[in-house]
């Protein structure tokens, strides 16, 4: 999934540069600021995922559904369907909640340049909440497994 996201993002970024759909305003320092947010997001997500697998996963015995014996393609498909549904409503909720809007999500909508990199322009609290929600959906709700025996 991560590799797919990187490839899609890179292709979209190249297409934006080579075949722009609209002209973007010049914003001094935007590229550096956006790159810093992307780096921060990657470090934060990696840290949360490592902490999850070090501390939560070994002691977690609760799975609402147990997909660990299912094929990886089925786990990925079920996770995609569930997370797409949940994240749609979670996104709507961040727009409707004054607290979440002001403290996290407003930053994502603040840039004057709307482009692929803006996807990653998020407040660290929002990144942490999204990552924990995604991990919870995958491993607690669905009981997905990282065990290699479920590859078939």
Where in the sequence are the language-model features?
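Specific transmembrane helices
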Residues: 1-63, 68-88
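Membrane-embedded catalytic scaffold of the fatty acid hydroxylase/desaturase
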Residues: 36-48, 70-152
């Amino acid at each position: 999934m991560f590799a797919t996201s990187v490839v899609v993002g890179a292709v979209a970024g190249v297409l934006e540069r080579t075949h722009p759909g609209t002209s973007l305003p010049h914003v001094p320092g935007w590229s550096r600021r956006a790159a810093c947010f992307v780096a921060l997001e990657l470090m934060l997500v990696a840290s949360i995922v490592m902490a999850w697998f070090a501390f939560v996963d070994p002691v977690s015995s609760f799975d609402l559904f147990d997909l660990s014996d299912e094929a990886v393609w089925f786990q990925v498909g079920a996770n995609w369907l569930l997370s797409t549904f949940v994240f749609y409503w979670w996104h709507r909720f961040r727009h409707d909640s004054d607290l979440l809007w002001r403290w996290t999500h407003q930053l994502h909508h603040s840039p004057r340049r709307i482009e692929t990199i803006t996807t990653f322009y998020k407040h660290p609290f929002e990144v942490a909440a999204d990552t924990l929600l995604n991990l919870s959906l995958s491993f607690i709700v669905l009981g997905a497994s990282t065990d290699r025996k479920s590859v078939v």
